[in-house]
């Protein structure tokens, strides 16, 4: 007897409450014992996810409700991890679209909804954070309907059920005026509106792998949904991978999800979401098929990367002093390991054996990888991010992003001017009547490189911005480059307070007294547009002659604290970010001044 199954994904914009909602569904379905302590955002298991409050990897879990097994997939909201979202949607029969009751649909909501509607999925719309002051559910429902209509939804998809919820407080209702204590209305809506499992359990096996995991114990793990047939441990199967010849393989283990645990299954059948291991050839999009009647499913497509960066061996004078893994072989092995599960990423070799070209879906996608490597003890240098240029019909084209910014009205002018300089085109402008404005732009992706820090300064930390890839379009005129030059250290040694104090009039510093510096290292932002070589390790000249002047009190302005994102956004083409487990430094590509002059002449 087949068990009743529902497969759903939760999709939403960043910070609209996906992971918190999953927490409450797990708790209220009785998946955890009553006495068990549950961490907040239990699905965000990665350290970086917990710190930043974002979901990076799509996760699977399952709950039991009234005899039905509900598989839930929690997806990332950032477009940089959209490669995850697209594949996950191929495993499910419906989606819960979470929309903030105040903000309404946002760019990533648009990105993921477009993918879901194109696959023919019928969403259940959940208006979350209904308890927030300023909640406007009717406006949000109308905006969601308009969004569906713009994205070409069918009449059936436009007739979507709506559930009102507060994931944080753990309740849901079908009418915002009702009172509710729990999530039952949402569970009931899932059972009512999500189609039951489809597929013939007695037909020949078809299982498409839509995401990968890796275990040092069993090797590659494929995660996917069984479209047809049954699978059990020890079964012989064929691996069908596009045009490649079919390969025979044997399944080692079949695992299913119960709560957050992975549980071994004796047999799984059509409609189940399972993990299988023991097959070395497993990859995203491949079909695991019956050995006697193999039939391949169409390959899954993942959007191509839009941003590329050079990862290279650290060649600074401090190379190898702070990291555990420093050689090109170790960096390449780590990147290869990342490729096993990070499907939207590409790694290519270059003419220089110490430099690798790494491409991803955005700045966040690549900086998360760099931060992970840094914490694992890797030491490396990276260059300025560049957009991936494609040639379409003989014309060079660049990626264009849909950008939404939400700012206070007093900052609107400065933000619009900055986006205009970066070749942005204003598409829409809406005021919420409470002193904030939402601006929608189409802007070249390279115009957004380095915009985050400027934007936060302009809006005094109150602005919200998010962008999502829209299309490739012919290259427009050049975007503006960085306005300020940099201050470059002329010597190697430790920074001296007196020298930094004397240099304060020249610009803002990145370094503090006592920091180790080397020749060619960038120590601050120059107040003018040219680079300036300075000596930050020069002490005060002391003599044995009694001076009539008293000692001057040295008061230093606190330095700018470099984070990985801010450093990568800041650098120019002739600079590198040196990343070690202990430090993030900015340096010139050529450390010696005469080499820099020679390189700039050659470039001219």
Where are these regions (language model features)?
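Conserved structured catalytic cores and adjacent interaction surfaces
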Residues: 3-20, 79, 105-114, 120-124, ...
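Interdomain boundary/hinge elements
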Residues: 38-40, 151-163, 197-208, 243-257, ...
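Acidic, low-complexity intrinsically disordered tails
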Residues: 1, 583-585, 591-604
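Conserved nucleotide-binding/hydrolysis modules and their immediate coupling elements
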Residues: 206-309, 319-321, 484, 493-543, ...
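A short, contiguous, amphipathic alpha-helix enriched in charged residues
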Residues: 316-340, 557
């Amino acid at each position: 007897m087949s068990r009743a199954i529902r497969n759903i994904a939760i999709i939403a914009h960043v910070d609209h409450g996906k992971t918190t909602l999953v927490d409450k569904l797990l708790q209220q379905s009785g998946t955890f014992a009553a006495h068990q302590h549950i961490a907040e955002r239990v699905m965000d298991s990665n350290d970086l996810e917990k710190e930043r409050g974002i979901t990076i990897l799509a996760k699977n879990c399952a709950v039991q409700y009234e005899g039905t097994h509900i598989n839930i997939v929690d997806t990332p909201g950032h477009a940089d991890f959209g490669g995850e979202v697209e594949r996950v949607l191929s495993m499910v029969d419906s989606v819960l679209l979470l929309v903030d009751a105040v903000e309404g649909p946002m760019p990533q909501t648009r990105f993921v909804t477009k993918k879901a509607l194109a696959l023919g999925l019928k969403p259940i719309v959940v208006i979350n954070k209904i308890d927030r002051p300023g909640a406007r559910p009717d406006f949000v429902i109308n905006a969601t309907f308009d969004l569906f209509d713009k994205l070409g939804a069918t009449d059936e998809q436009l007739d979507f059920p709506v559930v009102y919820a507060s994931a944080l407080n753990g309740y849901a209702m079908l009418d915002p005026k009702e009172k509710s204590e729990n999530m039952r209305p949402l569970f009931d809506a899932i059972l009512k509106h999500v189609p039951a499992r489809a597929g013939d359990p007695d037909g020949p096996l078809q299982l498409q792998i839509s995401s990968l995991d890796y275990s040092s114990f069993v090797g590659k793990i494929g995660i996917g949904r069984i479209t047809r047939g049954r699978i059990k441990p020890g079964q012989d199967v064929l691996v069908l991978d596009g045009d490649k010849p079919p390969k025979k393989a044997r399944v080692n283990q079949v695992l299913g999800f119960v709560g957050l645990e992975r549980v071994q299954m004796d047999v799984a059948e059509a409609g189940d979401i399972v993990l299988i291991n023991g097959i070395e050839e497993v990859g995203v999009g491949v079909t695991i098929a019956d050995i006697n009647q193999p039939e391949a499913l169409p390959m899954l497509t993942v959007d191509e990367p839009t941003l590329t960066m050079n990862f290279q061996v650290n060649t600074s004078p401090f190379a190898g002093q702070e990291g555990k893994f420093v050689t090109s072989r170790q960096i390449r092995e780590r990147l290869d390991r990342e490729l096993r599960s990070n499907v939207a990423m590409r790694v290519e070799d270059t003419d220089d054996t110490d430099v690798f070209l790494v491409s991803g879906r955005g700045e966040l996608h690549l900086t998360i990888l760099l931060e992970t490597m840094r914490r694992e003890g890797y030491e490396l240098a990276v260059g300025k991010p560049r957009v991936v240029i494609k040639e379409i019909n003989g014309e060079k084209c660049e990626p264009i992003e849909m950008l939404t910014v939400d700012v206070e009205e007093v900052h609107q002018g400065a933000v619009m001017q900055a986006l205009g300089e970066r070749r942005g085109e204003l598409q829409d402008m809406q005021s919420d009547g409470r002193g904030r404005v939402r601006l929608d732009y189409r802007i070249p992706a390279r115009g957004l490189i380095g915009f985050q820090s400027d934007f936060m300064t302009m809006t005094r930390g109150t602005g919200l911005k998010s962008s999502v890839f829209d299309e490739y379009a012919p290259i427009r005129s050049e975007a503006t480059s960085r306005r300020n030059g940099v201050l470059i250290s002329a010597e190697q040694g430790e920074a001296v307070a007196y020298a930094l104090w004397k240099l304060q009039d020249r610009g803002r510093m990145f370094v503090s007294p006592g920091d180790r510096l080397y020749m060619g290292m960038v120590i601050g932002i120059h107040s003018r547009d040219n680079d300036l070589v300075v000596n930050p390790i020069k002490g005060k000249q002391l003599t044995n002659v009694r001076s009539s002047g008293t000692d001057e009190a040295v008061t230093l302005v606190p330095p700018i604290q470099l984070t990985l994102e801010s450093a990568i956004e800041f650098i120019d083409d002739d600079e590198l970010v040196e990343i070690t487990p202990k430090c993030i430094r900015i340096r010139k590509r050529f450390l010696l001044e005469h080499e820099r002059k020679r390189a700039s002449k050659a470039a001219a």
